[in-house]
Protein backbone atom coordinates (compact mmCIF):
# COMPACT_ATOMS: atom_id res chain seq x y z
CA UNK A 1 0.00 0.00 0.00
CA UNK A 2 1.45 3.36 -1.02
CA UNK A 3 0.56 6.34 1.13
CA UNK A 4 1.10 9.63 -0.62
CA UNK A 5 3.11 12.11 1.41
CA UNK A 6 2.96 14.88 -1.15
CA UNK A 7 3.70 17.67 1.32
CA UNK A 8 7.09 16.24 2.22
CA UNK A 9 7.89 14.97 -1.27
CA UNK A 10 7.37 18.46 -2.68
CA UNK A 11 9.72 19.85 -0.03
CA UNK A 12 12.43 17.37 -0.99
CA UNK A 13 12.00 18.09 -4.70
CA UNK A 14 12.23 21.84 -4.08
CA UNK A 15 15.56 21.35 -2.26
CA UNK A 16 17.13 19.06 -4.86
CA UNK A 17 20.72 20.00 -5.80
CA UNK A 18 20.63 23.15 -3.64
CA UNK A 19 24.17 22.63 -2.33
CA UNK A 20 22.95 21.86 1.20
CA UNK A 21 22.77 18.69 3.25
CA UNK A 22 19.11 17.71 3.51
CA UNK A 23 18.54 16.54 7.11
CA UNK A 24 15.29 14.56 7.37
CA UNK A 25 14.32 14.11 11.02
CA UNK A 26 11.44 12.47 12.87
CA UNK A 27 10.48 9.73 15.28
CA UNK A 28 11.45 6.17 14.33
CA UNK A 29 8.97 4.48 11.95
CA UNK A 30 7.22 7.73 10.99
CA UNK A 31 8.04 7.27 7.30
CA UNK A 32 11.40 9.02 6.80
CA UNK A 33 12.96 6.05 5.03
CA UNK A 34 9.84 5.44 2.92
CA UNK A 35 9.82 9.07 1.83
CA UNK A 36 13.48 8.99 0.81
CA UNK A 37 14.02 5.42 -0.42
CA UNK A 38 10.65 4.94 -2.10
CA UNK A 39 8.82 8.14 -2.96
CA UNK A 40 11.80 10.38 -3.66
CA UNK A 41 13.83 7.54 -5.21
CA UNK A 42 10.97 6.81 -7.62
CA UNK A 43 10.72 10.50 -8.47
CA UNK A 44 14.44 10.66 -9.32
CA UNK A 45 14.26 7.51 -11.47
CA UNK A 46 11.25 8.85 -13.38
CA UNK A 47 13.15 12.11 -13.85
CA UNK A 48 15.93 10.24 -15.63
CA UNK A 49 18.46 9.60 -12.86
CA UNK A 50 20.26 6.26 -13.34
CA UNK A 51 19.97 3.72 -10.51
CA UNK A 52 23.75 3.54 -10.07
CA UNK A 53 23.79 7.28 -9.37
CA UNK A 54 21.64 6.86 -6.25
CA UNK A 55 23.85 5.62 -3.39
CA UNK A 56 21.74 4.26 -0.52
CA UNK A 57 23.19 3.42 2.91
CA UNK A 58 20.58 2.30 5.50
CA UNK A 59 22.68 2.21 8.68
CA UNK A 60 19.97 0.43 10.70
CA UNK A 61 20.19 -2.55 8.31
CA UNK A 62 22.47 -5.38 9.47
CA UNK A 63 23.81 -5.74 5.94
CA UNK A 64 25.28 -2.24 6.24
CA UNK A 65 26.45 -2.37 9.86
CA UNK A 66 30.13 -2.02 8.94
CA UNK A 67 29.38 1.42 7.51
CA UNK A 68 28.45 2.73 10.94
CA UNK A 69 32.21 3.35 11.04
CA UNK A 70 32.50 6.80 9.40
CA UNK A 71 35.79 5.92 7.72
CA UNK A 72 34.27 2.86 6.03
CA UNK A 73 31.14 4.84 5.21
CA UNK A 74 33.23 7.48 3.45
CA UNK A 75 35.22 4.87 1.53
CA UNK A 76 32.06 3.05 0.44
CA UNK A 77 30.33 6.18 -0.84
CA UNK A 78 33.42 7.44 -2.66
CA UNK A 79 33.85 4.05 -4.33
CA UNK A 80 30.41 4.50 -5.89
CA UNK A 81 31.16 7.98 -7.24
CA UNK A 82 33.00 6.98 -10.40
CA UNK A 83 32.21 9.67 -12.96
CA UNK A 84 32.81 13.35 -12.29
CA UNK A 85 30.45 14.25 -15.12
CA UNK A 86 27.43 12.56 -13.51
CA UNK A 87 25.22 13.85 -10.70
CA UNK A 88 25.04 11.51 -7.69
CA UNK A 89 22.51 11.33 -4.87
CA UNK A 90 23.62 9.97 -1.48
CA UNK A 91 20.97 8.67 0.95
CA UNK A 92 22.23 7.92 4.50
CA UNK A 93 19.44 6.45 6.63
CA UNK A 94 19.39 6.67 10.47
CA UNK A 95 22.72 8.50 10.50
CA UNK A 96 22.91 8.63 14.31
CA UNK A 97 24.20 5.04 14.15
CA UNK A 98 27.47 6.46 12.81
CA UNK A 99 27.91 8.58 15.95
CA UNK A 100 29.55 6.85 18.93
CA UNK A 101 28.49 7.20 22.56
CA UNK A 102 31.78 8.90 23.37
CA UNK A 103 31.21 11.44 20.60
CA UNK A 104 27.75 12.15 22.00
CA UNK A 105 28.82 12.45 25.64
CA UNK A 106 32.09 14.36 25.22
CA UNK A 107 31.81 17.71 23.41
CA UNK A 108 35.61 17.78 23.03
CA UNK A 109 35.56 14.64 20.87
CA UNK A 110 34.95 15.52 17.20
CA UNK A 111 32.04 13.74 15.54
CA UNK A 112 33.63 11.94 12.61
CA UNK A 113 30.36 11.66 10.67
CA UNK A 114 30.40 15.42 10.22
CA UNK A 115 33.79 15.12 8.53
CA UNK A 116 32.34 12.59 6.09
CA UNK A 117 29.43 14.90 5.28
CA UNK A 118 31.76 17.87 4.92
CA UNK A 119 33.82 15.92 2.41
CA UNK A 120 30.73 15.07 0.38
CA UNK A 121 29.62 18.70 0.41
CA UNK A 122 32.84 19.68 -1.34
CA UNK A 123 31.97 17.49 -4.32
CA UNK A 124 30.08 19.54 -6.90
CA UNK A 125 28.31 16.49 -8.33
CA UNK A 126 26.96 15.03 -5.07
CA UNK A 127 23.60 15.81 -3.43
CA UNK A 128 23.39 14.53 0.16
CA UNK A 129 20.32 13.41 2.13
CA UNK A 130 20.53 12.24 5.75
CA UNK A 131 17.73 10.83 7.92
CA UNK A 132 17.78 10.43 11.66
CA UNK A 133 15.76 10.06 14.83
CA UNK A 134 17.63 12.38 17.16
CA UNK A 135 17.35 16.15 17.00
CA UNK A 136 20.47 17.02 18.97
CA UNK A 137 23.00 15.06 16.96
CA UNK A 138 21.41 15.63 13.59
CA UNK A 139 19.24 18.68 13.00
CA UNK A 140 20.65 21.07 15.63
CA UNK A 141 24.28 19.97 15.48
CA UNK A 142 24.49 19.60 11.71
CA UNK A 143 22.81 22.94 11.10
CA UNK A 144 25.29 24.51 13.54
CA UNK A 145 28.31 22.58 12.27
CA UNK A 146 27.73 23.43 8.61
CA UNK A 147 26.72 27.06 9.21
CA UNK A 148 23.96 27.53 6.71
CA UNK A 149 24.80 24.46 4.62
CA UNK A 150 22.25 22.21 6.31
CA UNK A 151 18.55 22.14 5.48
CA UNK A 152 16.13 20.36 7.83
CA UNK A 153 12.86 18.69 6.86
CA UNK A 154 10.99 17.35 9.87
CA UNK A 155 8.64 14.41 9.24
CA UNK A 156 5.65 13.64 11.46
CA UNK A 157 3.53 10.49 11.63
CA UNK A 158 0.53 10.55 9.30
CA UNK A 159 -1.77 13.51 9.70
CA UNK A 160 -5.44 12.57 9.80
CA UNK A 161 -5.81 14.00 6.27
CA UNK A 162 -3.24 11.41 5.11
CA UNK A 163 -4.51 8.58 7.31
CA UNK A 164 -8.24 8.84 6.52
CA UNK A 165 -8.11 8.27 2.72
CA UNK A 166 -5.69 5.35 3.18
CA UNK A 167 -7.73 3.70 5.94
CA UNK A 168 -10.72 2.60 3.84
CA UNK A 169 -13.07 3.63 6.67
CA UNK A 170 -15.66 6.36 6.97
CA UNK A 171 -14.27 9.42 8.73
CA UNK A 172 -15.87 8.65 12.11
CA UNK A 173 -14.47 5.12 12.23
CA UNK A 174 -11.14 6.39 10.91
CA UNK A 175 -11.01 9.07 13.62
CA UNK A 176 -11.61 6.57 16.42
CA UNK A 177 -8.94 4.26 15.00
CA UNK A 178 -6.55 7.20 14.58
CA UNK A 179 -7.01 8.27 18.21
CA UNK A 180 -6.52 4.72 19.44
CA UNK A 181 -3.74 3.38 17.19
CA UNK A 182 -2.08 6.58 16.04
CA UNK A 183 -0.59 7.55 12.70
CA UNK A 184 2.56 5.50 12.20
CA UNK A 185 2.22 4.42 8.55
CA UNK A 186 2.70 0.68 9.11
CA UNK A 187 -0.30 0.56 11.44
CA UNK A 188 -2.53 0.67 8.34
CA UNK A 189 -0.96 -2.55 7.07
CA UNK A 190 -1.71 -4.54 10.23
CA UNK A 191 -4.72 -6.82 9.56
CA UNK A 192 -6.60 -6.54 12.86
CA UNK A 193 -6.72 -4.72 16.19
CA UNK A 194 -4.73 -7.39 18.01
CA UNK A 195 -1.91 -7.07 15.48
CA UNK A 196 -1.98 -3.28 15.73
CA UNK A 197 -1.66 -3.39 19.52
CA UNK A 198 1.16 -5.94 19.36
CA UNK A 199 3.01 -3.82 16.79
CA UNK A 200 2.83 -0.68 18.94
CA UNK A 201 3.83 -2.51 22.11
CA UNK A 202 6.79 -4.03 20.29
CA UNK A 203 7.89 -0.65 18.97
CA UNK A 204 7.82 0.85 22.44
CA UNK A 205 9.87 -1.89 24.06
CA UNK A 206 12.22 -2.89 21.26
CA UNK A 207 12.84 0.43 19.52
CA UNK A 208 11.90 3.60 21.38
CA UNK A 209 12.77 2.66 24.95
CA UNK A 210 15.75 0.50 24.01
CA UNK A 211 17.13 3.08 21.57
CA UNK A 212 17.00 5.87 24.13
CA UNK A 213 18.42 3.74 26.94
CA UNK A 214 21.33 2.56 24.79
CA UNK A 215 22.04 5.87 23.07
CA UNK A 216 22.12 7.90 26.27
CA UNK A 217 23.66 5.13 28.39
CA UNK A 218 20.74 5.15 30.86
CA UNK A 219 21.20 2.74 33.76
CA UNK A 220 17.60 2.80 34.98
CA UNK A 221 15.58 1.60 31.98
CA UNK A 222 12.57 0.87 34.20
CA UNK A 223 12.63 4.44 35.49
CA UNK A 224 12.66 5.81 31.96
CA UNK A 225 9.69 3.63 30.99
CA UNK A 226 7.78 4.69 34.10
CA UNK A 227 8.42 8.34 33.27
CA UNK A 228 7.04 7.80 29.78
CA UNK A 229 3.89 6.35 31.32
CA UNK A 230 3.54 9.28 33.73
CA UNK A 231 3.71 11.73 30.83
CA UNK A 232 1.32 9.59 28.79
CA UNK A 233 -1.21 9.76 31.64
CA UNK A 234 -0.94 13.54 31.86
CA UNK A 235 -1.11 14.79 28.26
CA UNK A 236 -2.61 18.25 28.20
CA UNK A 237 -1.69 18.91 31.84
CA UNK A 238 0.90 21.39 33.04
CA UNK A 239 3.96 19.62 34.36
CA UNK A 240 7.67 19.97 35.07
CA UNK A 241 10.54 17.89 36.41
CA UNK A 242 9.75 18.76 40.02
CA UNK A 243 6.09 17.73 39.74
CA UNK A 244 7.02 14.47 38.05
CA UNK A 245 9.69 13.75 40.66
CA UNK A 246 7.11 14.36 43.39
CA UNK A 247 4.77 11.92 41.64
CA UNK A 248 7.47 9.25 41.72
CA UNK A 249 8.32 9.94 45.35
CA UNK A 250 4.71 9.94 46.55
CA UNK A 251 4.00 6.59 44.91
CA UNK A 252 6.52 4.91 47.18
CA UNK A 253 7.45 2.59 44.34
CA UNK A 254 10.49 4.38 42.95
CA UNK A 255 12.37 7.62 43.62
CA UNK A 256 14.01 9.54 40.79
CA UNK A 257 15.75 12.86 41.33
CA UNK A 258 14.62 16.06 39.62
CA UNK A 259 17.88 16.45 37.60
CA UNK A 260 17.48 12.88 36.31
CA UNK A 261 13.86 13.58 35.35
CA UNK A 262 15.01 16.72 33.51
CA UNK A 263 17.56 14.69 31.57
CA UNK A 264 15.01 12.01 30.70
CA UNK A 265 12.56 14.64 29.42
CA UNK A 266 15.33 16.11 27.27
CA UNK A 267 16.21 12.68 25.85
CA UNK A 268 12.57 11.93 25.00
CA UNK A 269 12.19 15.32 23.31
CA UNK A 270 15.43 14.96 21.36
CA UNK A 271 14.24 11.54 20.18
CA UNK A 272 10.91 13.09 19.04
CA UNK A 273 8.86 10.75 21.28
CA UNK A 274 7.29 13.73 23.05
CA UNK A 275 6.99 17.42 22.23
CA UNK A 276 7.13 20.32 24.65
CA UNK A 277 4.82 23.32 24.57
CA UNK A 278 5.93 26.28 26.68
CA UNK A 279 3.73 28.77 28.53
CA UNK A 280 3.36 32.22 27.02
CA UNK A 281 1.98 35.29 28.81
CA UNK A 282 -0.24 36.80 26.12
CA UNK A 283 -0.73 40.21 27.73
CA UNK A 284 2.87 40.47 28.93
CA UNK A 285 4.20 39.12 25.61
CA UNK A 286 6.81 36.90 27.26
CA UNK A 287 7.52 33.27 28.06
CA UNK A 288 6.84 32.29 31.64
CA UNK A 289 8.93 29.11 31.99
CA UNK A 290 7.86 26.01 33.85
CA UNK A 291 5.50 24.26 34.11
CA UNK A 292 4.99 23.28 30.48
CA UNK A 293 2.81 20.80 28.61
CA UNK A 294 4.05 17.63 26.94
CA UNK A 295 2.28 15.93 24.04
CA UNK A 296 2.97 12.56 22.44
CA UNK A 297 4.15 12.63 18.84
CA UNK A 298 2.07 9.51 18.16
CA UNK A 299 -1.08 8.64 20.10
CA UNK A 300 -0.82 4.93 19.35
CA UNK A 301 2.54 4.76 21.13
CA UNK A 302 1.06 6.72 24.02
CA UNK A 303 -1.89 4.36 24.32
CA UNK A 304 0.32 1.27 24.06
CA UNK A 305 2.42 2.48 26.99
CA UNK A 306 -0.76 2.53 29.07
CA UNK A 307 -1.91 -0.88 27.82
CA UNK A 308 -4.73 0.83 25.87
CA UNK A 309 -6.62 1.44 29.13
CA UNK A 310 -6.73 5.24 29.37
CA UNK A 311 -8.77 6.46 26.42
CA UNK A 312 -9.92 9.94 27.44
CA UNK A 313 -11.09 11.39 24.16
CA UNK A 314 -10.99 14.97 25.50
CA UNK A 315 -7.23 14.82 26.11
CA UNK A 316 -6.49 12.71 23.04
CA UNK A 317 -8.32 15.20 20.83
CA UNK A 318 -6.25 18.05 22.31
CA UNK A 319 -3.05 16.09 21.61
CA UNK A 320 -4.21 15.37 18.04
CA UNK A 321 -4.97 19.05 17.41
CA UNK A 322 -1.52 19.98 18.73
CA UNK A 323 0.09 17.42 16.40
CA UNK A 324 -1.89 18.73 13.42
CA UNK A 325 -0.75 22.30 14.11
CA UNK A 326 2.87 21.15 14.30
CA UNK A 327 2.38 19.17 11.06
CA UNK A 328 1.22 22.37 9.37
CA UNK A 329 4.42 24.10 10.41
CA UNK A 330 3.15 26.29 13.23
CA UNK A 331 4.99 27.14 16.45
CA UNK A 332 2.60 26.21 19.27
CA UNK A 333 2.65 27.50 22.86
CA UNK A 334 0.30 27.30 25.84
CA UNK A 335 -1.32 30.69 26.42
CA UNK A 336 -1.88 32.42 29.76
CA UNK A 337 -4.19 35.42 30.19
CA UNK A 338 -4.02 37.17 33.55
CA UNK A 339 -7.15 38.97 34.76
CA UNK A 340 -8.22 40.70 37.98
CA UNK A 341 -11.32 39.46 39.77
CA UNK A 342 -13.22 40.36 42.92
CA UNK A 343 -12.86 37.82 45.73
CA UNK A 344 -14.58 38.70 49.01
CA UNK A 345 -14.43 42.39 48.19
CA UNK A 346 -10.76 42.32 47.26
CA UNK A 347 -9.07 42.39 43.90
CA UNK A 348 -7.17 39.22 43.09
CA UNK A 349 -5.20 38.00 40.11
CA UNK A 350 -6.38 34.96 38.20
CA UNK A 351 -4.79 33.15 35.28
CA UNK A 352 -6.92 31.78 32.45
CA UNK A 353 -5.48 29.27 30.00
CA UNK A 354 -5.59 29.27 26.22
CA UNK A 355 -4.86 25.78 24.94
CA UNK A 356 -2.81 26.90 21.97
CA UNK A 357 -1.12 30.14 20.91
CA UNK A 358 -0.32 29.39 17.27
CA UNK A 359 2.26 31.38 15.30
CA UNK A 360 3.64 31.28 11.79
CA UNK A 361 5.34 34.38 10.41
CA UNK A 362 2.95 37.30 10.86
CA UNK A 363 -0.01 34.99 11.50
CA UNK A 364 -1.32 34.21 14.97
CA UNK A 365 -4.36 32.27 16.19
CA UNK A 366 -5.67 31.57 19.68
CA UNK A 367 -7.28 28.14 19.86
CA UNK A 368 -9.29 26.22 22.44
CA UNK A 369 -9.93 22.47 22.13
CA UNK A 370 -13.42 21.58 23.34
CA UNK A 371 -14.66 18.02 22.99
CA UNK A 372 -18.28 19.16 23.06
CA UNK A 373 -20.30 22.37 23.33
CA UNK A 374 -23.65 21.04 24.54
CA UNK A 375 -24.99 24.35 25.86
CA UNK A 376 -24.28 28.08 26.17
CA UNK A 377 -22.70 27.62 29.59
CA UNK A 378 -20.01 25.40 28.09
CA UNK A 379 -19.44 27.86 25.24
CA UNK A 380 -18.94 30.67 27.76
CA UNK A 381 -16.53 28.51 29.76
CA UNK A 382 -14.41 27.74 26.70
CA UNK A 383 -14.35 31.30 25.40
CA UNK A 384 -13.69 32.94 28.80
CA UNK A 385 -9.94 33.24 28.21
CA UNK A 386 -10.29 34.13 24.52
CA UNK A 387 -12.48 37.18 25.06
CA UNK A 388 -9.95 38.58 27.55
CA UNK A 389 -7.17 38.70 24.97
CA UNK A 390 -6.58 42.37 24.08
CA UNK A 391 -5.65 42.03 20.41
CA UNK A 392 -7.36 41.39 17.08
CA UNK A 393 -5.84 38.02 16.13
CA UNK A 394 -8.36 35.30 15.38
CA UNK A 395 -9.88 33.37 18.30
CA UNK A 396 -11.08 29.83 17.58
CA UNK A 397 -12.79 26.96 19.37
CA UNK A 398 -12.38 23.53 17.75
CA UNK A 399 -15.04 21.04 18.80
CA UNK A 400 -15.89 17.48 17.85
CA UNK A 401 -19.38 18.49 16.79
CA UNK A 402 -20.20 18.20 13.06
CA UNK A 403 -21.63 21.53 11.91
CA UNK A 404 -20.78 24.45 9.60
CA UNK A 405 -18.15 26.98 10.66
CA UNK A 406 -19.76 29.92 12.40
CA UNK A 407 -18.83 33.02 14.39
CA UNK A 408 -20.68 33.91 17.57
CA UNK A 409 -21.58 37.32 19.02
CA UNK A 410 -18.25 37.52 20.85
CA UNK A 411 -16.34 37.18 17.59
CA UNK A 412 -15.20 33.63 18.37
CA UNK A 413 -15.02 31.25 15.39
CA UNK A 414 -16.36 27.75 16.07
CA UNK A 415 -14.89 25.04 13.82
CA UNK A 416 -15.90 21.38 13.71
CA UNK A 417 -13.06 18.92 14.21
CA UNK A 418 -13.24 17.34 10.75
CA UNK A 419 -13.37 20.75 9.04
CA UNK A 420 -10.17 21.62 10.88
CA UNK A 421 -8.34 18.34 10.26
CA UNK A 422 -9.27 17.85 6.60
CA UNK A 423 -8.81 21.40 5.29
CA UNK A 424 -5.37 23.01 5.36
CA UNK A 425 -6.81 26.53 5.25
CA UNK A 426 -9.46 25.87 7.93
CA UNK A 427 -7.99 28.40 10.38
CA UNK A 428 -8.62 31.17 7.85
CA UNK A 429 -12.33 30.46 7.28
Residue map of PLM features:
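Interdomain hinge/linker elements that couple catalytic modules in large macromolecular machines
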Residues: 2, 157-338
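Walker A (P-loop) phosphate-binding loop of P-loop NTPases
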Residues: 29
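A cross-kingdom feature that marks ATP-driven nucleic-acid transaction machinery
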Residues: 2, 25, 33-34, 41, ...
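Pre-Walker A adenine-sensing motif
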Residues: 2-17
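Short regulatory helix/loop adjacent to the ATP-binding pocket of P-loop NTPases
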Residues: 135-151, 167-168
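Conserved Walker B catalytic segment
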Residues: 96-129
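Short glycine-rich substrate-engagement loop in P-loop NTPases that contacts/grips substrate
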Residues: 55-85
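Structural recognition of the conserved hydrophobic beta-strand(s) that form the central parallel beta-sheet
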Residues: 91, 127-133, 154
